[in-house]
């Protein structure tokens, strides 16, 4: 991933960027496989009404793979002779940290936008 600024849309952060941020953080925490990532996200955000779908989570993971940030490894599933599980690990941790840094700037901007809307209208 190049050292370039993430371009802002001028409004709120896109869902895919939001999910990619969480994929990176959960990989740092070694929550390593897709379905587990999906379960954790759904559990974490259930209370506030955000339920990421399977397709968006996997698209986010695949973008991180395409960007060279994550890589997949296949391991045999414990207790199963022929089944494999796909795990995600960092391929380029520096690029992952850069992405998080860029998203932090964007999320701070979005927070200010939302706070202004709440202040101005309620």
Curated annotation (Swiss-Prot):
Pfam families: RTP
GO molecular function, one term: DNA binding
GO biological process, one term: DNA replication termination
Source domain of life: Bacteria
Keywords on record: DNA-binding
InterPro entries recorded: RTP, WH-like_DNA-bd_sf, WH_DNA-bd_sf
Keyword DNA-binding (UniProt): yes
Binding partners and assembly: Homodimer.
Annotated function: Plays a role in DNA replication and termination (fork arrest mechanism). Two dimers of rtp bind to the two inverted repeat regions (IRI and IRII) present in the termination site. The binding of each dimer is centered on an 8 bp direct repeat.
Listed name of the protein: Replication termination protein
